[in-house]
Amino acid sequence: MEDQAFIRNKSGSLTAVCCAVLVLIAGCSSSPKNSEPASSNPFSTNGTNNASAIKINKLRTFGDSYTDLAYTSPRAMTNWAVEVSSMANGLENYAIGGAKAASTSSIDFATQLNNWNTTNSAITDKDLTVVYFGYNDIGRGGTSDNFAAARAGYTDGVNRLIAGGATNGNNRMFVTLITDWSRTPGISDSLHSQVVTWNNFVASVANSNPNIIAVDLYTVFNRVQDKPSDFGLVNATDVDKERSYTDYLFFDTLHPGSKGQEIIARVFKHYLTRGWNWASTLDAGTSATNQLNQDLDNNLLKAFNQTATTSQGLRLVPLTTSNTDGRRSGRDSRVFNLNQTARNNLEESVANGVALDFAPANSGIWSQGRLGVALTQNAQSTRLTDIEDRYSTRFNSNATTLYWMQPYNNFLFSTQLSRLDHAFTQNGLDDLLNRSVTNDRSAHTWSLEGKLRYTYAFDGLALTPWASLSQQNHTLNGGLIQSLYTSDVQFSQTKTRDIYSGLGVDLQFSPIAIGQGRKLLIGAGLNHLQSLRREALTLGMTEQINPGVQMSETIDRSRVRKTQLSLNAVVAEHKGISYGASYAVDLQKPSETKAVRVTANIPF
């Protein structure tokens, strides 16, 4: 009954607690790893276990919201699978928030495996598969059938992966011992024994196959919660959304925040590197737990802030392209906006270009932000369509933008300073007069915009209201303008200024599985843009036939009021291929502004 004593006294010796939790595992292996010689690391490129030498071919993950990108991304939260994928050539993340191992819903382990099968993405040499379930099988109230359905679903799923080659040759499978769910703020302490039962089962699955390794998050997170300062945290008990990006463990009552996700990623990386030799040879149980605790005592997993993650390096972002899962990134492409003058000329034209950015710090809340520069280009033209047309125009705008994006809790603040260079070309033709003219004009704009977003995350939906304020200073350069029917006119340089405010809300629904590995992603947006100030435009001009006469004209510029509705849908195929369609309309001028756009994103 020693185990029961430890269950009631969870604040006792950690090593003793972890050994008590896993003591039943040590002798249950049908093919014990500790009877075999040390296994070389199949992911090593040079025979060592150094992090720089590890290269996985494809990382596949199955699980729940702890792994699902649709949960972490809207919250600007680190995702452990993305972090670990820095060691791989690619990531296939099939996890879905709320999923169970038990085959009881459309998002369970079996469904995720079906989604994988429909992609025709076969397991090949040096692939790593990670299975991470259990929290939702316990739930808030505990299991009602002693995990009978969960065990069956988990076993069937693992067997399907084994049959697919997940443990053949140089391939490996990681199964994950969950953190102590009962120490999560929103869960009762009474569920501790069920966590122990579940982890014992998962460990037995690992011990049944020499190429399946149990990754012990239970032991690590108990150490984190008992002494958070060792892991760069000040609190591992309470919820604080803002500080979960910096020094608190929990984002909400059920989930760790970015720092917790970073710890999970670090544990997986440890098993792939420094911990490989013992993890691949020892059964999940007392010996493996002792070895993991020894690594923790030797500070091999503590210095998280000293290890740069993928989010801290330089990043090249292609704009107006989709992510691999078919969704556009709100943290990337939405922040780069053409100024309103250019928008009025381009209507529904979208900027294309690239951005290069980096995190301004290696730790703390600033490490979640991005500083960078974006280069974008817009173009639109109208052509002569029949004999009644007299003019065609072409408009180009090239922009260089310095930007800063900073998440804080569910807020995302972005600011950008842009220099836009515009070029206008107008061609005129009159066949009857046998006369044609070409006029080239240029202008530039300095634009400063600030935007604040806040994301409300619900089951299956992310709702993001936002507000913006911008100022633009425009300069229209002087030039000679030719006309088909009057004398040429020399225009002088002209300057003006605009101030705009914007309000809007964006909706993004969680991916919907539509069969054969495809996902349907649906989004919508409603925004209102209004000019707070538009200065009048004063034009100075001189006709060529009257060179000594300077004339001027002041043009009052009407206020801008636009309320735009946009709808978009993307079908994400496997291997990053996606197809999308969008519809946009200005509700104040619907008959004049309807626009439909169809896109395809095919990586090569």
Give residue ranges: language-model regions:
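Gram-negative bacterial Sec-dependent N-terminal signal peptides
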Residues: M1-K33
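Bacterial Sec-dependent N-terminal signal peptides
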Residues: E2, G27-A53, S280, G285-T286
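Conserved SGNH/GDSL esterase-like catalytic core that processes O-acyl groups on lipids
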Residues: L69-A152, T286-T289, N293
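Outer membrane beta-barrel transmembrane domains
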Residues: S106-D108, A399-Y403, F491-F604
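Outer membrane beta-barrel translocator domains of Type V secretion systems
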Residues: N120, L296-L463, R557, A581-N601
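Active-site segments of SGNH/GDSL-like serine hydrolases
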Residues: Y132, R160-V196, V215-T219, Q225
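Solvent-exposed, glycine/polar-rich loop segments of beta-barrel outer-membrane systems
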Residues: P185-H192, K227-K241, N344, T385-T393, ...
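Mobile gating loops/cap/lid regions near enzyme active sites that modulate substrate access
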Residues: P185-H192, V205, I212-S258
